Amino acid sequence: MRFRDRVVLVTGGASGLGEATARRFAAEGGKLVIADINTEGAERVASSLPDALAVTMDTGDATSVERGIAEAVARYGRLDVIFNNAGIDGQQQALHEMDLANWEKVRRINGDGVFYVLRYGIDAMLRSGGGAIVNTSSTAGLTAQDNISPYTFTKAGIVGLTRSAAVEYAARGVRVNAVAPTVVMTPLVEHFIANAPDPEQMRRQMESFNPKPGIPTADDVAGVVLFLASDDAAWVTGHTIPIDGGYVAR
């Protein structure tokens, strides 16, 4: 029970990777704060956990983030762990044809949003005596891919921000790391495969994307997140861990 009585905030916690990771934290004794722009989804997840609070949070809105973290601290009195996970993919477009609204939306949520959670989350952690943060980057933040420049821009920025925050707060008891998953098998990806013109071909294509055959599950990623957030990783800070079956190593 590595997280017994620790207060854990998960952004984007209403579905997918956020939900799977929240359930893992709860199974190891954590008190969960499920933050999501989808209020109904957050309440659904929170109500299924032993000790959890649902908060409505638009991570791209600083006021919403500040309010949500204040709700968490008001309920539990402290904040020990943050899984800074909320994000979007955006539209696939060539850079010279990029719709500016698409660029701004991805930057606001994936870039500004991660900063806002760090800004207000670290402030709460310092008042609690320290803590651990895990940001969600992507293999797209470590390598170049076509037609997803806003996503790559923001996910690479998370890598740099993770390092900066880790160095800035190491002496004050706050560790900051990141995970960089490849494509993960979530309900959204399952839906994408099922609705492809040739679902079996799409599945085979995705399963051969990385050197290690197959597609990691949300639970595969959650295991790494929990390690980084736990005392097992007490001397690990400032790092981004690819969860990619060797994709970045090629």
Language model features: what each stretch is:
Residues 123, 167-171, 234:
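Alpha-helical segment proximal to the catalytic Tyr-Lys
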